[in-house]
Structures are given as structure tokens and as C-alpha cells.
Swiss-Prot record:
A GO molecular-function annotation: histone H3T11 kinase activity
UniProt subcellular location: Cytoplasm; Nucleus; Cytoplasm, Perinuclear region
Keywords from the UniProt entry: ATP-binding, Cell cycle, Cytoplasm, Developmental protein, DNA damage, Kinase, Nucleotide-binding, Nucleus, Phosphoprotein, Serine/threonine-protein kinase, Transferase
Protein name according to UniProt: Serine/threonine-protein kinase chk-1
Protein source organism: Caenorhabditis elegans
Residues annotated as domain Protein kinase: 24-286
Consequence of gene loss (knockout): RNAi-mediated knockdown leads to premature cell-cycle reentry of the Z2/Z3 primordial germ cells in L1 stage larvae. RNAi-mediated knockdown and DNA damage induced by the ribonucleotide reductase inhibitor hydroxyurea in germ cells results in impaired DNA repair, but does allow for nuclear division. In the proliferative zone of these germ cells, nuclei do not arrest following DNA damage, but prematurely divide and are smaller compared to wild-type.
Top enzyme category: transferase
Gene3D superfamilies tied to this protein: Transferase(Phosphotransferase) domain 1
Cited function: Serine/threonine-protein kinase which is required for checkpoint-mediated cell cycle arrest and activation of DNA repair in response to the presence of DNA damage or unreplicated DNA. May also negatively regulate cell cycle progression during unperturbed cell cycles. Required for checkpoint mediated cell cycle arrest in response to DNA damage in germline cells. Delays cell-cycle reentry of the Z2 and Z3 primordial germ cells in response to transcription-induced DNA damage as they emerge from cell cycle arrest in L1 larvae. Essential for embryogenesis.
Amino acid sequence: MSAASTTSTPAAAAVAPQQPESLYRVVQTLGEGAFGEVLLIVNTKNPEVAAAMKKINIANKSKDFIDNIRKEYLLQKRVSAVGHDNVIRMIGMRNDPQFYYLFLEYADGGELFDKIEPDCGMSPVFAQFYFKQLICGLKFIHDNDVVHRDIKPENLLLTGTHVLKISDFGMATLYRNKGEERLLDLSCGTIPYAAPELCAGKKYRGPPVDVWSSGIVLIAMLTGELPWDRASDASQSYMGWISNTSLDERPWKKIDVRALCMLRKIVTDKTDKRATIEQIQADPWYQHNFGQVETPNGRPLKRARNNDENITCTQQAECSAKRRHLETPNEKSTLAERQNASFSQPTKTEDLLLTQHIDMSQTNSNLLQRMVCRMTRFCVVTDIRSTYQKVARASEHAGFGVRETDDYRLLVTWREVSMMVSLYTMGDIPDKPRVMVDFRRSRGDGIQFKKMFMDVRNRMHEWICTDGNNWLANLGYVPRNPQIVNGGGVNVEHSASSINVDV
């Protein structure tokens, strides 16, 4: 990659001055897509200064494609100018003849879908905790005249202290200019989360489509499943919800009455009756005191009723530079994760690109912690060669496509979902063959990916052991699984502080 230029763009004043790429170092790839990749980078003079770099290939691309990258940058820069704890911050942009580079805040806690257990979801206290942050972030975005149009768990990132951040503005647009709202007409988004008016190709108001998507995210958090494939007349489950005839079926029977009443106001096909952000924040379920959330970090933080929280932020971005048309769940990046380490966040691109070398042990550290947070992994008592064969066989028996990529790595696919399976020998357990099997989503819906993982895991249950967690713990890593504790709170292992969600 050559040194980036600062050729004239609509955002020329905000683009960083020319800097050689050697001033920062790529630690690892966070995600890959059809048009580029997302990289975790650090300042080579100060490796504690980190950011996510979205590297987008523009070679032989149309003017519209490049204009949409600039639009994504400008919209996210617009909301970053003031900044909000629940929205990923844009740091800057550079470009050369082959690539555009977007530099974004780095979040070290994974994607929200990592926390959603298939067919189970998560506890109501944590669902409310994350939902409140999502609503606060959406309110801020809408107040700045921007609509996101692709709200889903894969685009909601977390910090190590469970601060939720809205990311990926690749489908965002301005819905209001100088106080005058306009109707939108582009059909875009991810089908299971998209509002019916958007699926139908009608003109639509901006904010209500984000409200609808937030409701689908809440359903996924509470139940671990999506209510339908598409909000259209062709969907029996969708029509059952609209006609109020399917409440004794899944997923609705898993949801308590108070939450269901709120969802009725959010997930309604009547846009003029769909709840506003303010109405959601006043709803009894939103305001209900479920208890407190324990986090693995420093000082206690308070949640205030209907107010923006003042929580220290940290991100990663996703490879979706193009303005995508309506599609099935698409490829998104996976976060590198670090526990017990808080990266500094550069305030502008020059602060990041000041930069010697990061120790390769740092890369290994990120790789291991990435496994810990995802929880889509297990340890087996067979050697690596036989493990490889067993994983391939289990995947094939589940009806998945299996393709060898390189040594001890498999690409497993089913419909629109694909996952990469990597095997690691646990060499520090003497005289015992132990292999860590790690699954990473590379494309498609996160909840369906987890179901695929569970299917393969269940087919290999007779070889699975618990040594993997002990191995990671001995290396200084501990899986961070939220748990319900006394009084209805949520506990995270080795918690030293809490976030009070009293309202």
C-alpha cells in the first residue's frame, strides 16, 4: 500500500495529511468483505494507541461506489463531531488511487450477537441494559438528522465494560435538512430486521424504520431467534403477529407480557402508530428496574432515566462501503478482543499515524482473547489430524457444505451463512492431546451462525473436554459470561464494579 494522498474530496478539510503507512502497524485482520477488510492498527511508537481501519478497494469502481464511501464518511463524521457514548466515532479518512481508508474508534468487547444464545437469548436485565443504550444512540443519531437503516446485532458493538456502540453507517442517509423531513425511497438493510414499508419498496419516513429494527433486535435478545425471515404478506409468522393470532407460539410465548406490550407499539406495520423514541423511553418495560449489571471493569457507573450516559467509550468497523440494496444477512467483520487492557483512542488521524514495532505476542494475545469473548469454541481430547476429520464429518452430517482452505482450517457453509473453523494444538498440556476448535462467522446472520456452531458441537460432544477454559485461564484469559446474581442483577466473572440500571 502506498502513502495516502489528500486529493480533493467533499471532506478534504477533515482528511488527514499525507502520512506513510509505516507510521502504524497492522496487528490483525478483524473482518473481511467483498470490497475490503477491517484491520486493527496501532501507533508504532505507542502501541497502546489503537483504532480500526476500514480498508476499501476502489480500483475499477464506479463514481457512485466512491461517492457512497464519502457519504458514509461524512455522515459518521457528522455524528462524531458532537459524539455520543453509544455511537462509534469516526477519526478520519485517507485515500490513494487504489484504496479508501476509514479510521474508526475501536471497541474491544465483541458484537452484540456474541451475547445472544440461540433459542434462549439473554436475561431480561441484560436485554434491557443493551436496548436502553441502543435507543439512546438512535435518539442521538436521529437528532442529528441521520437515519441508520441497518440496525442489527452484528452492527452493535460492545466495549469490555458492556457499553453498546452503533456502527456501520454504510446505509445511512440524511432524512431531514434544515428542519424539513423528506421521504426516503431506497430499499436497503438486512431483510429479517427491515420494516415492512422498506421491504415493500414504498416511500418511507426514516426514524420509524430504525425503531422497527430496534424492536427486532430486542426480540432476538429476549428469545434467541428472529420472528420471521421477512416482514411481508408472504410470511405466515409475520401475518400471525400482525393479526394477533400467534402469541401462543414461538418466539412470542417466551416474552413476558410487559415486554410484549411494548413490542406491540414498536413492531407495528402502521407507521403512524409506531412508537417514537420518546414513547419507548416512557414505556413501563423500558423503565422497569430489573436490578444491576455487574461489569469486569473499574469504577461504578450510573444509568440515568432517559438520559444519555457518560460512559467511557471505545470500536471496530465493518466492510460495507457500498450502498447495498435489500439483501439477506451479509458478511460482517468479527472483533479482535482484549481483556484487562484499555486502548487509548486517537482524536484525529495524525495522533494515530505517529509511529516501532508491536511485539508479535500482542497479536497472539488478541487472537486468544478473540476466542474467549466469542464463546463459539470448544476443546477436544483428540489429536489435531483426527479432530480435523471429525469436524468435517460432523459438519457434513449436519447438512453443511465443507471446503478445505489451508492447514487445519475449514470453511463451513449453509445457505447464506458461512463460518471459518480453525484448529489450535494446546501444546502446554504435556502427554495429553488437546485441540482448541474455534468457530468464526465470516458471512451471514449471527444467530444462524450460532445455531450451526451448536449443531457441530453437539455432534462432537463425546470428545469435548473442559481443559480449554483452564488453558485460556492459565494464559491469563477468562471467558466473560454474564450470569444472573442475587436480586436479579447480572454478574460477570471477576467483576470489580457495577453499572446501576435503576430508573
